[in-house]
Swiss-Prot record:
Positions with biased composition (Pro residues): 265-274, 393-410
Keyword set includes Ribonucleoprotein: no
Domain of life: Eukaryota
Protein name: Hepatoma-derived growth factor-related protein 2
Record flagged with keyword DNA damage: yes
Lineage, uppermost ranks: Eukaryota, Metazoa, Chordata, Craniata, Vertebrata
Encoding gene per record: hdgfl2
Ranges in a coiled coil: 320-370
Location of the region described as Disordered in the Swiss-Prot/TrEMBL record: 84-484, 561-662
Amino acid sequence: MPHNFRPGDLVFAKMKGYPHWPARIEDVADGAVKPPPNKIPIFFFGTHETAFLAPKDLFAYEKNQERFGKPNKRKGFNEGLWEIQNNPHASYNTPAAASSSDSEDNQPAAASDAEEEEEAVVPRKAETGSDDSDSGSEDQKKPAVKRKAPALKRPPVKKARASSSDRDGEESGSPSEPEPSPSSDSDSGKNSDQDFTPQKESGGRGGKKPAGRGRRKKASSGSDSDSGSQSDQKAARSDSEDEKPRPAASGSESQSGSKSDSDSEPPPPPPPTRKAPQGRKKAEKPPPKPRARKPKPAPERAPSSSSDSDSDSDTDRVSEWKKRDEERRKELEERRKREEAEELRRLREREKEEEEKRKKDKETKVRRGSSSSGSSSSDDEVDDHPLKKSKKPPPPPIPAPSDSDSPPPSELKKKKESQKGRQKKEKEVKEKKERPVKEKKPQRSEEKHKAKPKAEKPKRKPVRPPEKKVEKKKEPSPEEKLQKLHTDIKFALKVDNPDIEKCLQALDELSSVQVTTHILQKNADVIATLKKIRRYKASNAVMEKATAVYNKLKLQFIGKIETGKPKPNEKNQEEQDAQNTDDSKPVNGESEGERKDVSESESNSKPTDQDNPDENKSPNGIRPDPDEPADQLNDSTEADPTADADVKEDSREQDEQMSSES
């Protein structure tokens, strides 16, 4: 890679999409915009365009002449090779027509005057020329968006690169095109219009680039408005074409460079006006300038625009036909789908109606209790209905429009026939299924009538067995007897309606019940009621009977607990003493072993046994039977005033009842 390049060095410059191009390193003019970092301003021979390139894309001319100096078909390349050898100090082409562009209003200038003007305007070219030259270099070497900045004022550049002769036309024709008068156009034609004119069909890029160069010279000569107008007109027509041909590799670089060049050198008053609008290229420049120059450039761009429009129109037509065909196909498919969906809906609705009618017929038959003949006739009637309805579905009116739009009537007929076949098959299957069902229904109805009484019988049965079970349960269990008798006694001695006879019967039964200590422990309330009844003053018979039963139960407990538990009551002390003397004798037919077992079982007594530990302890130190404390409590309650008060209240109530009855 070349090391350090200096202004004036001859090099081969490489841009993306272009061969190594003969070029020269330019010097940055005073006041011009500085190139971006690590970029070098380049002047391309043959096209006379400028760009900013990195040092890696530059190759020394002398060293690489044999390698890159071979002729090429690229437009302007061969001219560049000739120019770098014969005129290495060449600058922007400025034919004599440039003077005429400067003096459009008054005088056509000579070629010598034009050359002098070129020299005077060189800095300006660095500014505006750099715009167009940079953009041109982008167009040919590395076309990019920079060209768009002025490119908005330039026609498409895509096809201009086709031949090297066209670039010559660009160089020579650039000053001539922007000029308002046809004479300037003819002057530009003198240089290289012969090469350029045959390529107008391709919308030659020469037309655009000359517009840019014309602007450069006009900026120097004061004809910026004219060149701007033409470039604006061309840009308006071919903005889309400008964007297509340019690779964006170095466009941003050249664009920034060209903008900086054009904006940096506004010493004369006209360029500052350019500065502001270039910030808004599309907004301000096109409206004022293109109006004056529209009529002349129109014929120049007519062929290219017409060719482009023709090609576009052809493609548009093809795409339109395709779109229409696709739309038609979609519409046909949608219609077919809709028709099929509607037919299916109709079939389903008809099937539902048939099923409902059949159900109604079946219900009516079951109610009337019609015979099998009636059911068969109804089957025939039901069969007639689907036949009548099957005739309706085939002629749906909807498929007609699809026939008009689409050419497949045969397909629709096939579909109809297939649908008819399906309907018939479905109906036959349904009829086969329904016939046995209809025959079975009367049988089922009879079975239901028979099943109903059976269902009622089990409801009655469960009521009876519980009574038997209750009786069976009550007979064996003394606990239940005790509880029942206890409740009977309570109800019999109610204050409102005392039933003494019933109470006596219950007491008799209670005395006959075989009771164990465990049962009495669970039902201590029975003993408490017996205690209270002993003082029932309303009837002496009840008092006597209750005392007898109470004493009997008490004797049973005392007999069991003789050895270990003396009674605290004074009444029973004598009996306990007598029993203590006869420890060895069994009481109530019990042996000593049984007594011990009972005493052990009674050792787990209730907490009530611990109320009077001194009284309950026997001389042997054995705890009393758990049933004894109940007796003791009962005895203690006899002496309590609360028990006496209860008895007195009962007696008073009974006396009041007797008095009221009398």
